[in-house]
Design a protein with these regions (language model features):
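Hydrophobic/aromatic-rich alpha-helical bundle segments in the mid-to-C-terminal region
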Residues: 175-179, 190, 194, 212-258, ...
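Short secondary-structure transition hinges
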Residues: 170-205
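Helix-turn-helix
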Residues: 24-30, 36, 92, 96-126, ...
Length: 271
């Protein structure tokens, strides 16, 4: 399918879903549907996307040019590849905070001059919006893939928890600013990105609610329990460190058990 190849090309180009949609003159929802294979794309728009991404249009449209996304790839985390300005901004915002970091701090980390940075990124706000767009774009793509692998609400719930934990450990810096710097966003970006976060929460809400309806989760407070589970996962960047003794996969397995306890999952009886 052309959609996953377009997504891969966009991510290699360091472009967010929002920036791509704006450049191609479509809505974010439409471009997301294209990348996920839920809607068709015209040849002209494929060509425009290829030009935007600096990709070969023939590779994008040839069925055998790239393998389809394999099951489980949402668990794979290659090194984060950001353009230098965004990598510099991420480093500065994590270390100094959005309000504490200056454009000069970002430029130094990006190994650019201040005028050179301003040429492409006129304000810190543009950098923050791009980083949070990238964060939510990757997280939602992974969460949708994880959820799609599940057979029934309990498995979908546990896969979503695993996905959240893996993202907030492997992508700890993105997760950190996602939790700490929402207050720095200005409108309309703040409302738009907040809506994406709500959409992620609703994925978990839906599985907890359905498992409760089937008698598989017994919490009397499914709404609150689902929010507690997501908050527990998104808080990981505040304490987990790659230098610590527990690798991401182990943390994920532990948190799945914690989450099942929170929702009071029915466990098989011993013996």
């Amino acid at each position: 399918m052309v959609g996953p190849r377009l997504r891969d090309a966009r991510q290699r180009a360091g472009l967010t879903l929002r920036a791509t949609a704006d450049a191609l003159g479509v809505s974010v929802g439409t471009w997301s549907a294209v990348e996920n294979g839920r809607t068709r794309i015209t040849a002209d728009r494929v060509a425009a996307a290829a030009s935007l991404f600096g990709a070969d249009v023939e590779i994008l449209v040839t069925p055998d040019a790239a393998p389809p996304q394999a099951a489980g790839t949402w668990r794979d985390f290659p090194p984060l590849d950001l353009p230098p300005p965004l990598a510099g901004a991420l480093s500065a915002f994590v270390e100094l905070g959005y309000h504490g970091a200056t454009i000069r701090d970002v430029a130094q980390r990006a190994q650019l001059s201040v005028p050179g940075l301003y040429h492409h990124w006129p304000t810190k706000q543009h950098l923050l919006v791009a980083l949070l767009d990238r964060t939510m774009d990757e997280l939602l793509t992974r969460a949708e893939a994880a959820r799609a692998e599940g057979d029934g609400p309990v498995e979908r719930f546990t896969l979503l928890v695993e996905c959240l934990v893996l993202f907030h450990t492997h992508r700890r810096e993105l997760g950190f600013i996602g939790a700490s710097e929402m207050r720095g966003l200005e409108e309309p970006a703040r409302s738009r990105i907040a809506a994406l976060r709500v959409g992620l929460q609703r994925m978990v809400d839906a599985e907890v609610r359905e498992a409760g309806r089937r008698g598989l989760f017994t919490t009397p407070l499914p709404h609150e329990a689902a929010r507690a589970v997501v908050t527990m996962c998104t808080a990981l960047p505040t304490w987990w460190s790659p230098a610590g003794p527990t690798p991401p996969a182990t943390v994920a397995a532990q948190y799945v058990e914690f989450a099942l306890d929170v929702v009071r999952a029915r466990r098989p009886q011993a013996g």
